[in-house]
Amino acid sequence: MTDIPDRKEAVISLWPEFAKAIVSGKKTVEFRRRIPLPALSARIWIYATRPVKSVIGFAYLEAIVQGDVNTLWSRYGREAFLSEQQYRDYFEGTEKATAFLLRDHQPIRPINLDQLKEIRANFQPPQSLTWLRKEETQKLVSLTSQVE
């Protein structure tokens, strides 16, 4: 029987400055244009893109809010750790936005791309997010508890 992802564990790719801000708790909202929606309370593993190329922590999904670009900026912009201009540039050409409200941010010892490929042979950093299967999550968790 194949272990099908249940939308409770996912990896999301972010630029390093935003990834670090999430795991430190400074950034509590992540905005996206179009993205598959995880289950509420899902654990979102934070992958920092180049030059870091590692999972550096996780946070839990408290809520998903979808709506008008202007409304979401007004409501959550202060928690997003980005400028209004960056936000406007990202959402240029669309009227709808999705906000992930994050809680319980946890930095971890970085898990690099080679280690991620040991968990999933064809692992590629996701464009938006990728679901994890139960056995993949277990392997990821075991790597977070290993002593260097």
Curated annotation (Swiss-Prot):
Question: What job does this protein perform?
Answer: Shows sequence-specific endoribonuclease activity towards single-stranded RNA (ssRNA), with a preference for the bond between pyrimidine and adenine nucleotides. May also have 5'-exonuclease activity.
Recorded GO MF terms: DNA binding; endonuclease activity; exonuclease activity; RNA binding
- What is the name listed in the Swiss-Prot or TrEMBL entry for this protein? ASCH domain-containing ribonuclease
User: Which Pfam family is an annotated match for this chain, by its short name?
Assistant: ASCH
Cofactors, names only? Mn(2+); Ni(2+)
The cofactor binding remark recorded in the entry reads: Active in the presence of Mn(2+) or Ni(2+) ions. No activity detected with Zn(2+) or Co(2+).
- Does the keyword section mention Chloroplast? no
Species this protein is from? Zymomonas mobilis subsp. mobilis (strain ATCC 10988 / DSM 424 / LMG 404 / NCIMB 8938 / NRRL B-806 / ZM1)
InterPro entries noted in UniProt = ASCH_domain, PUA-like_sf
Q: Which domain of life is it from?
A: Bacteria
Where the record annotates domain ASCH, the positions are 13-70
Q: What is its EC number?
A: 3.1.-.-
Q: Which residues form a coiled coil?
A: none
Q: Keywords for this entry?
A: DNA-binding, Endonuclease, Exonuclease, Hydrolase, Nuclease, RNA-binding
Q: Give the taxonomic lineage as stored in the record.
A: Bacteria, Pseudomonadati, Pseudomonadota, Alphaproteobacteria, Sphingomonadales
